[in-house]
Amino acid sequence: MDASEEPLPPVIYTMENKPIVTCAGDQNLFTSVYPTLSQQLPREPMEWRRSYGRAPKMIHLESNFVQFKEELLPKEGNKALLTFPFLHIYWTECCDTEVYKATVKDDLTKWQNVLKAHSSVDWLIVIVENDAKKKNKTNILPRTSIVDKIRNDFCNKQSDRCVVLSDPLKDSSRTQESWNAFLTKLRTLLLMSFTKNLGKFEDDMRTLREKRTEPGWSFCEYFMVQEELAFVFEMLQQFEDALVQYDELDALFSQYVVNFGAGDGANWLTFFCQPVKSWNGLILRKPIDMEKRESIQRREATLLDLRSYLFSRQCTLLLFLQRPWEVAQRALELLHNCVQELKLLEVSVPPGALDCWVFLSCLEVLQRIEGCCDRAQIDSNIAHTVGLWSYATEKLKSLGYLCGLVSEKGPNSEDLNRTVDLLAGLGAERPETANTAQSPYKKLKEALSSVEAFEKHYLDLSHATIEMYTSIGRIRSAKFVGKDLAEFYMRKKAPQKAEIYLQGALKNYLAEGWALPITHTRKQLAECQKHLGQIENYLQTSSLLASDHHLTEEERKHFCQEILDFASQPSDSPGHKIVLPMHSFAQLRDLHFDPSNAVVHVGGVLCVEITMYSQMPVPVHVEQIVVNVHFSIEKNSYRKTAEWLTKHKTSNGIINFPPETAPFPVSQNSLPALELYEMFERSPSDNSLNTTGIICRNVHMLLRRQESSSSLEMPSGVALEEGAHVLRCSHVTLEPGANQITFRTQAKEPGTYTLRQLCASVGSVWFVLPHIYPIVQYDVYSQEPQLHVEPLADSLLAGIPQRVKFTVTTGHYTIKNGDSLQLSNAEAMLILCQAESRAVVYSNTREQSSEAALRIQSSDKVTSISLPVAPAYHVIEFELEVLSLPSAPALGGESDMLGMAEPHRKHKDKQRTGRCMVTTDHKVSIDCPWSIYSTVIALTFSVPFRTTHSLLSSGTRKYVQVCVQNLSELDFQLSDSYLVDTGDSTDLQLVPLNTQSQQPIYSKQSVFFVWELKWTEEPPPSLHCRFSVGFSPASEEQLSISLKPYTYEFKVENFFTLYNVKAEIFPPSGMEYCRTGSLCSLEVLITRLSDLLEVDKDEALTESDEHFSTKLMYEVVDNSSNWAVCGKSCGVISMPVAARATHRVHMEVMPLFAGYLPLPDVRLFKYLPHHSAHSSQLDADSWIENDSLSVDKHGDDQPDSSSLKSRGSVHSACSSEHKGLPMPRLQALPAGQVFNSSSGTQVLVIPSQDDHVLEVSVT
C-alpha cells in the first residue's frame, strides 16, 4: 500500500453520496478496471431482503471506490453511516510464486490485520489473471496454484471471499463470464454488509429512542442519528424508506409539542422556545440546507428552523418520488401546525413575523412545484395548490392591515417602523433566488413598500384564488375570499365594488343554511347599502338583522331603531310607500274565527283574531294592520247552503300557520337525517380499546353544496294589493313576542271571502305578507227557509206512538205571529196532539233564543201547527207524536202453504219475507207560510211482528199453532189473544191451550199460541181463521190512547186424518236383536181411519159392488242411510175407502250400523191415472210404471248387489223404451191427512261378531 496518497476530502451531504468501498493492493490494476466496474455494477438489480419481515426490494447498487486507509475504518462509538466503508477489496494480479512470497503475502497479512483490529469482516480478495503477463514470465506457477495459496493462507474458512477476474480488459466470452461472476459476488457481499450494518444501526437507533424519557436525552442528537439512516436510504435510492424516517421524526416532535401543551413538557423543548428573530420562510431549492442542519446539531435552531429543515428534506424526497401535489398538501398542514405550535410553546414572535413566514413559505412551495411540473399538470391539479394561494392571500391581507396599507389615510410613522422591522427580519435574499424576478422575497418586499403595490399584489392574489376555487367547484371558499375582498373595498371607501361580493357570499350562505356567516355578512351588507344610499335595501337588511337572535340585544335594537327613525321622518313625496317583506318584522302564527265555522249570514258579524309574533326587540307602534280580502261567488252556488257550509267547515275555527323558514331555504328542512355510528379502534395484540368516537356516514349528503338560480332573500319589490274588501285594525302596539289582534266585519253580500295579504304600516314603511298560506276563507250565505222532518228513532214502528222532530230553518224569512204549518191528514196515520208540546228557537250558532208552547188544532183532513215568532236565520225545533195503524196481511197469505210438505213451505216463506220487517209509507203534504207550494214528506213505518201458522196432528186430533215473532228492538206485552173461525161451521170448536192472559215478547224472540180443533159431525173441508192479539210497549207507562190489536188471517185445508201408517222391524228368526249385515223383516201397516169423505172423490176413486177403493203408492226411504232396503222399496196398493181398512206390506231391510237406529220413513201418494188433469206436475223422477210395482212380498225377486241401496227419494223404475209413453201421476197427500204412528221409534241393532271395524250410530 502506498502511504503517500493524499487524504480523502470531507463528505459533502449531497444526493451524489454512494456507499463507500475501499480498495487496497495494486492501485494501478484497480484504476484500469474501474471504468468497467463502475459501469457494470448498477446495471443488474439485486433483491434486497431485509429484517423484521419487511418486504423485499429490487435495488441497483452503486459504490464510491476509494483507496484503503486505516483512518477510514470506523472507531468505537462512531455512528456515521455515510462515511462507513461497507466493503474492503484487495486487488492483485500476482502470478509469480516468488513475488507472492516476497511482497504480496506480507501486504495481504498487514491488510487483514488492520481489518481485524477494527472488527471489520466484510472483505474480498480479487486476483486478476492476465494472459499477456504470463507470456513474459517463463517460470510461473499455474494460476490455480497462486489462487490456492491465497485461499489457504487467508480464506481457508471463507473460500468464497477470493475471486478470480480473467482478462478484465478483453472482449471475450470467458472475460464476460468472469465479470458476471465477480459482479454477482460483489453485489451479494455489498447487500450482506448493508443488511448487517443497517440492522445494527437501526437497533442502536431504537435503543436511543427508547431512552427518550431519561433525563439528558436530546432530540437533536437523536435527530442526527435517524437522519443518518435516512441519508443511507437516500444513498441507496430508497426514497420511500428515507421519507418514512423524516415522517417519524416529524410525528415524534409533534407529539412532544402536544404533550407540552397538555403540561407534560420535555427539558430539551426549551431550546426551541427561544424568540423568533428570523422569518425568511422555507428553503426548498437546496437538497440539504446545511446551515439549518448545523444549527440543529448545535442545538441552536428555533422551532421555525427545525420545521423548515424537516419539511425541506421531505419535499426533496417527495419530488424524487414524483409526488409534487403531496408537497402542497403537507405544506398547508405544516404552516397551520406551526402557527399552533408556536402558541402552544408560547414562543415570542414579533407582530406580523409569522404572517411573513407563512406568505414566503406558501409562494416558495408553489414556485418549487411549478419548477418541476408543466402548466397542464398545474392547471389540472389546482385543487391541491389552491389552499396555499388562499393562505398566502389571507396572510398578505393581515400584513396590509397591520402595516396600515389598507387604511384610508395610509400608513403612519408607527406603521412604517413596523414595516421596517418586518423587512429586517427577512434578512438578505438567498443567492439561489437573487436572480429570480418574481421570487417570494421580492414580492413581499414590494407589496409592503407602498399602498398601491400592496393593493396590486393583494387583488391579484385574491382574484386568482377566487378563480381557482370557482374552477374546481368550491364555491363556498370562493365566496369567503370574496367576502374578505369586500371588506378590503369597504376600507378603501369603494362600497359599490364590495356589494357584489357580499351579495354573492350571502346567497351562498343562505342556500346552505350557515346561520352565523349569514348574520355577519348581512351586517357588512347593511353598512355597504347605507353608504350607497340604497334606502329600501338597507331597511330590509336592517329588519332582518333586528330579528336575528345571533346578534346581541344592543345590535338588534340599533337596527330596529334605524327603521323607526326612517319611518318617523317626513316623506319628500307624500303617498310614497316603501314595501318590505313581513317575515323579518313579524310572523303570523295562527288565526281564529268567531263563529268558529267561519260561516255567517248576510248582516251577521264576523270576528277574526290573529296572533302575530313580533320579531323586533322593542315595542313598535303600528299605525294600521290591514288584511286584504278577495271576494268571489261560487259558480256551483247550490252547494253553498247553510247546511253544506256547516258540515264542511272546521269546527274549532283555529288555523295554524307554519313557521317562517327564512333565512334558511326550504331545502334545508328536507335534508336526510344524520347517520351516526359508534367507532371503536382496538389494539390488535390484546384487543384493548385504543380510541372511540362517532362518525357520520352520510356527511357527503349533508354538506354538499346546493345551487339556487334565484336569490333566496325575500325580494323587496313585494306588490301591495288594493281591493274593495279589507279588514282593518288601527293604532296597535306590537310588543316583542306574541300579540293578539282582532278584526270585526259585518257581512253584506253572500259569497266566499279569501284572506289574501297581511300588511302592517309603520309610517311610510309597509311590511307585507304577500300570500297567506294555507288558504283562509270565510263564507257569507243567504239561505232560503227550509223544513225538515225526521224520526227520533232509527225506524218508526207501526201500531204504537212514535216521536217525529220538525226543524224549521227560517233563512232570510221572519216568522210572524199567526204563521202556521198546515198538515194534510193521512188515512192510516194519526197525528197525536199533546198539551205539553213546546217549540224551541235557536240562533244560527245553536244558542237558545226563546221557547214557547206549541198550539195544535186538528180536524178531519188538516192539522194546523202554529209557529212561534222567530227572526231571520234562526231555527225552530219541536216534536210531535204520530201513530200508524198496523195493517193485517192479505187473506190466505200463507194458507196455500199448508197443503204442501212442511220443509218446502218454510223455505218459501223465508225466501219471501226473510228477517226484515214489513214497511208502510205514509205521505203527508205540508203547506208552509213562506211558500205557495206544498212540501211533501214521506214517513216509513215498520210492522214489528211477523206471524206464521202450522197444523199439528196426534192421530185424529188436530191443533193449530200460531207463531208471533218480534223483529224490532223493543220489548212488547201481548194480551187477549183470540183465534176465531170466520166460516159457517157451527159444530167446530177452537179450544185455546194458552192459559195466560198477558205474555211478554222480547226483541228478536217468538211466542207460540196453540188451539185444539174439535167437531161433532163431519169436519169441514177447510177452515178460515182470524188471529188477533193486543200489544203495547213493555217499557212504556199507561198510554193516553188505546191501541188497536194486531190481526192475522189464514186458511187451513184438508186437515182431517185419513190414514194411519205404522212400521215395525223384526230380527231374523232365532235372534233376539237385529245385527249389522243381517236381513231383517220390515212390516208396514196402512190403516184407513174414516169412511168415504168429500175429499176422497177424485180420479183415484173406483167403485165396485157398492164398495169404494182408491189407489195409493207407498215408498220406503231412509234419508239417514242407516238401512239398506232390499228388493223393491215402493209399490201401488188398492185401498178400500172404509174405516179400519188395513193393508200390510212386508219387505226386507239390512242395518248398516250398530246402535239405536230410527225406522225408515214410509210415504204415501195418491196414484192418479195419466189422463188426470187435476194432479200435480211432478218431475220425471216421480213417475212410476205400474207394471213394475208390487205389494206382494213373496212375489219379489231375491235382492242382488245392485238392488241393495239406501233410498232417499222416489226413483224412476221405467226403462228407456217407456220414456216417451204417457205415465201415471202421483199426488202427495197433505200432511194433515196422514199420521205416522211409528215416528220417533228406534230399533236396537247389535254389531256382527266378525266385524273388525265397528261403526256405531248414535242418535
From Swiss-Prot:
Residues 1189-1222 are annotated as: Disordered. Keywords: Autism spectrum disorder, Disease variant, Dwarfism, Epilepsy, ER-Golgi transport, Golgi apparatus, Intellectual disability, Phosphoprotein, Transport. Disulfide bonds: none annotated. It is found in: Golgi apparatus, cis-Golgi network. One of its GO terms (biological process) is vesicle coating. GO terms for cellular component: cytoplasm; cytosol; TRAPP complex; TRAPPII protein complex. The modification Phosphoserine is found at S708. Pfam families: Ig_TRAPPC10, TRAPPC10, TRAPPC10_1st. Its main location: Golgi. Expressed in all tissues examined. Specific component of the multisubunit TRAPP II complex, which includes at least TRAPPC1, TRAPPC2, TRAPPC3, TRAPPC4, TRAPPC5, TRAPPC6A/B, TRAPPC9, TRAPPC10 and TRAPPC14. TRAPPC9, TRAPPC10 and TRAPPC14 are specific subunits of the TRAPP II complex. Interacts with TRAPPC14. Specific subunit of the TRAPP (transport protein particle) II complex, a highly conserved vesicle tethering complex that functions in late Golgi trafficking as a membrane tether. Belongs to the TRAPPC10 family. It is linked to Neurodevelopmental disorder with microcephaly, short stature, and speech delay: An autosomal recessive disorder characterized by global developmental delay, short stature, severely impaired intellectual development, microcephaly, poor or absent speech, and behavioral abnormalities including autistic features and aggressive behavior. This is Trafficking protein particle complex subunit 10. It comes from Homo sapiens.
